[in-house]
Amino acid sequence: MRNKKPPFEITNTMIHEIAEIAELVGKLTSTNQLSANPTLRRTNRIRTIHGSLAIEQNTLSLEQVTAVLNGKQVLAPPKDIAEVKNAYEIYERLEELDPYSVDDLLTAHGIMTRGLVDESGVFRSKPVGVVDQEGHVLHFGTLPQYVPDLVMELLDWVKNSDVHMLIRSCVFHYEFELIHPFADGNGRVGRLWHTLLLSKWNPAFAWLPVESMIHARQPEYYAAINASNDAGESTEFIEFMLSAIKASLIDAIYTSDEMSDGAMDKAAMRWRQIEKFLETHEFIMNADVRILCNV
């Protein structure tokens, strides 16, 4: 049945988190740092990709991911390098995607897993077990013959529900992983789609590295999935994800405040810009300094 509500409860914790997140989003967007600073956006995008792939056991460090995306040679497994390039490509096309389109979801999976899996850009044809980072089985995915209808039903619910998008996007994330529609790449695509949904609520989320925060709290991420699996509904996972989103916003605002004229004098602000650049680059050229410091 279309638009069937997935099982979850709206708790006081969620309501408080949503209020705080809305306030933080307002503060972040008022500074205009993300929209006005392409270097900061690229840095956050790289952190996003590194975080999401690291959750899936990609071995590249943040510095190596940066080097790959800067066109440099990196000594690493070809599969890991391909994952970085594929992920960057689809994140760069985020604005083109319709978050409620099954076809766009399949397109995103096709790009994310291009050259890496046989069933790329299509729903899986075989049963699959879902495991955590230690190889423990969390649950078994939906039988393949039911996957297309369940994904369509989930997207229809997300599109038509009047529940706040902050909650809807978290519900999608959990239910998508529960269905496990693809042979591989479910985690990467699920987190991408969560970001996509949030970006439709507020464009700032397209550049907010929530995936990096999930990676930093990976044991909690899997614990929340396990707890929700045991409960048969996604309430605990939603609460975890809202806390991760809030933490990402606080981090972004802190970075933004450090870069603002009100927080430091112009010379110190320029040094902070350069330090931030060097977090994801091996070196800095004179031309980069001129762009960063507007000199």
Regions from the language model: what does each represent?
Residues 1-295:
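FIC/Doc superfamily catalytic core
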